[in-house]
């Protein structure tokens, strides 16, 4: 991303560079995490005021780079940046033996924070209660439709690095393969989230030994 925002670039250098800059601007303009500051940045630059990308997003540079890479991976007709933005505000915590954690997981969204900071090797019991729709006709629980769509899935986030996604389903036990934050979502094509409806309430606790 540093190459894209470097000073001294000019329009018309190459279609690849133009496309990369367009993609970053589109992300910043439509992602709720960055949109307000991006608008201010644009106004300041057009009116000759002192401002820069580095000044505007110094504290969010790693987050933007992370979301930009995922945006490029998943972009397609129907992709919604606003639905796929990451929740950087929810604070994750480790669970004590007696603690319980629950969160709402929306079908019409990308990866969502659970608030769980997992310990490597620790087992957790989970249950996802509720129904959601992955299209106007198909309502399922967190186990999905039998062929993988609509299934509750998870991923570990650590240091802006993602693990491979894994299935959760409606109920079971998961062992953390690494230390990291647990993010979850309703499995559906990234370009098809707009017509999803409903939500599941996810309950988590440490498994008893």
Regions found by a protein language model. Name each.
Residues 77-209:
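Gly-Asp-aromatic-enriched flexible segments
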């Amino acid at each position: 991303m540093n190459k894209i925002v470097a000073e001294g670039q000019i329009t018309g250098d190459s279609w690849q560079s133009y496309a990369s800059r367009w993609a970053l601007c589109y992300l910043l303009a439509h992602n709720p995490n960055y949109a307000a500051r991006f608008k201010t940045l644009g106004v300041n630059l057009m009116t000759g005021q002192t401002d820069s990308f580095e000044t505007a997003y110094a504290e969010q540079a790693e987050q933007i780079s992370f979301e930009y890479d995922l945006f490029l991976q998943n972009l397609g007709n129907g992709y919604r940046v606003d639905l796929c933005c990451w929740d950087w505000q929810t604070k994750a915590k480790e669970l004590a033996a007696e603690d319980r954690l629950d969160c709402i997981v929306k079908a019409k969204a990308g990866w969502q924070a659970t608030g769980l900071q997992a310990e490597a090797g620790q087992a957790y019991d989970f249950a996802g209660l509720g129904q959601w729709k992955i299209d106007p006709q198909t309502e399922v629980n967190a186990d999905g439709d039998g062929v993988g769509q609509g299934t509750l899935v998870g991923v570990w986030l650590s240091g802006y690095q993602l693990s491979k996604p894994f299935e959760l389903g409606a109920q079971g036990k998961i062992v953390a393969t690494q230390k990291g934050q647990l993010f979850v979502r309703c499995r559906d094509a990234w370009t098809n989230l707009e017509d999803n409806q409903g939500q599941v309430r996810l309950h988590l606790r440490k498994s008893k030994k």
